[in-house]
Amino acid sequence: MRKKDRTEVCGVEMEADELARRVLRGRDLFDQSGGGVTFTGGEPTAQGPFLLELLALLAGVHRAVETCGHTPEPLFRQVLDATDLMLFDVKTADPERHRYYTGVDNALILRNLATLKESGKPFIVRVPLIPGVNDSLENMRATAALLQDAPGLQRVELLRYHKTAGAKYPMVGRRYEPPFDVNATPAVHDAFTPAGMKLLVL
């Protein structure tokens, strides 16, 4: 947490085996409910060796990893091999817009997405809808085109923009002023369903 006058570091450091033991305490619940463990973030692949060790220790438990896909290809393949389900974030199909808004183009992300598609591994694509940034029908259609011929694709989840983060800004002495219309209606109709993709708007 960061405040105007000081920084406070929160959390507990632990080794992968200790964390795995804690997770496995819920094994009976996982087995009864059909649930499991999801690694998300931040970006879980930023701690690649730790993530791979933990995934191995949790073999037998359903393991899901959510990633932005901007991960070195060898590491992505290793993580993919060790998971049961991938949650793959796609922000925009356009490389220039991706570079403008994130600081990097999406070439590596698209290569990893292609690897994911070819693997046949079950996956879900998640698209955060940011008004005026990536919510155009053109971008949604381009995103749908990226997902053609993907036998492992379970569904596409569109994550509507929400204002929850705005409440945190005053805590760090800042005003919340998003550079877009937060009330805009995303133009996403008819982009995914004609392609036969299951769509969930959250």
Task: Walk through the language-model features, giving the residues of each.
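Canonical Radical SAM [4Fe-4S] cluster-binding loop centered on the CxxxCxxC motif
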Residues: 1-13
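Radical SAM enzyme core and accessory elements
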Residues: 199-202
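Conserved AdoMet/S-adenosylmethionine-binding subsite of the radical SAM
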Residues: 20-164, 170
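A structural motif corresponding to the C-terminal lobe/cap of the Radical SAM core domain
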Residues: 148, 154, 170-192
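Electropositive phosphate-/nucleotide-binding environments in soluble metabolic enzymes
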Residues: 13, 137, 182-186
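Extended low-complexity acidic/polar segments
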Residues: 54-65, 182-195
